[in-house]
Amino acid sequence: MPEPKLHKIERIVVRGTNWVGDAVMTVPALRNLRRLFPNSHITLATRSLAKDLFSEAEFLDDLLVHEGGGLRSVVHQVRDWRRRNFDLAVLLPNSIETALVASLARVPIRIGYATDGRQRLLTHPLDLPDWRSSQHEVFYYLNIIARLEWLVNREQTFLNTQPDASLEVAETRKIAALDFLRHNRIKGITDGRLLIAICPGSINSRAKRWPAERYAALADRFIDECGADILLIGSAAEEAVSLEVSERMRNNPVMLTGKTELAELVAVLSLVDLLVTNDTGPAHIAAALGRPTLVIFGPTNPLTTRPFSPLAEIVRSAPDCAPCMLRECPIDHRCMTAIQPDEVFERARIMLGRRKMADERPFSACPQTQPLPEFNNKLEFIEQIK
């Protein structure tokens, strides 16, 4: 029999993940939670770093922002959660802190993975799935909601249907982004030239960065051969990397690194024809927005963390030592240095040639030198990464 308490859930809190890319990968789980509890009030507790991703999410009712760590943060969160009288806590991160907050806040039903010694703090602890290292992270988060589905309805459909990882940007924000780009003298938004964003940094891992001189060579080629406008994007912490790329270029890119809040960056990415990036948060954002996204992978595992979209492709050399998951390479960074600008440009050229995969806005794509290969449809893509 289904658990009766779960049919009376009125107020739900979801403890979100801490990094932007991870937050995007939780979207299918959040969307299916709304399907499971269509009339409940759902609050997402998240850090300010990720809150702007969800400000317009139709599957959420409220955002609860928290910062910092340690005892003070725990006390603050416990007070906030108690005041809101949540009936159910869905804990997406694996930390003991998140389970401690839910337990001390006296949330009656607490579900999450039984990791980090927190099993006794959860009312519904889940074992880690044995497939975690071989399936996409989207399914790791979705598995928690699938367990809830079983407890409520005695059926599991969420893991057998195509997850929806898409995000939308309101027209008003797109218009504001257009004005922002005009202010930065981006002509391509009005005359049909390609608008290509490049994210050469990575906040939490130097090993994930493709060399700056190669990004510079790639960007120059986009400008010389495709007539593209180039946007260098990233957070303030990545400004030095973007400056190095800019200084190594013959042409002039537009430096947006460190000049946009996440909400502005999301809106700008919704307008680009292509994003070329390392394995970073913007890769997941652009793909979720339905923009063609080319990700250069090195030490991380694309099987589990590539952007969850058929519009996202990867370039990878895959030496024997990859994926090592290290943040600093102890040897010669061969997973990244083996990838040449010509290889990335050719893949990008093919992606840009698929006009049907982008918006109908006309642009002058790079010249095609060979027929375009067929692209897998969305269902086939999902089967490849499950």
Feature map (PLM): residue ranges:
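Catalytic machinery of carbohydrate-active enzymes
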Residues: 1-386
